[in-house]
Amino acid sequence: MLIKKITLVFALFLLVFIITSQKNKSADTKKVRKGFEKLVDIQTLDSSIRVDLKYATTDNFMKKRLYFDIDKAYLQKVIAQRFIKCNTYLKKLHPNYRLLVYDAARPRSIQQAMWDALDSIPVKERTKFVSNPANGSVHNYAAAVDLTICDKYGNVLDMGAGYDDIRLIAYPSKEVYYLKKGLLTKKQIENRKLLRKVMTSQGFINIPTEWWHFNGVTRKQAKVQFAILE
């Protein structure tokens, strides 16, 4: 009788374990958006990198949440491996500094929503702020990153213009002009240059209209090497 009771208890325990394991497995699977399965969560490679996905919050130019099933910064593996070297280099230059990621892999459906939100701006001008989803952004291939620099407490460096600022003062190409105007300080430009120095050390490419945006490859290269995220 005792043996039967022990066998029954063990069987019930095993059943509960199997059900719980399946639920956890199912929950983990749901967390990964379709197309993201082979991408890398950059914090699994370097936990000192900070992440604050702006489109998973309302703290963005659209003032509304766009990401509901993306809560980590994902990149293509080869891009992620270069990216963590940038953070290592930054910490070598400034031990108290870290890279802070605002956006990484971005589905084209989200790109379309951003594009549509700026429909009051002519198409030719709009491409200065948001890539046309018809062409695809390098973000849509998980090969671009938006970021800044923060200290080990999470305090961001002053770049003279915020993330997603569409004013000309956010343009790297206009820094000398705004310095002469007294609207950017030398320190703010030095902070931007530090970010560029760190990112370009691993071949990332800054664009002339956004101090925060860096492509790991060109759009042409991304189309050849990677699948677009829809």
Regions picked out by a protein language model, each given a short descriptive name:
Residues 107:
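Segments that shape or occlude catalytic/ligand-binding pockets
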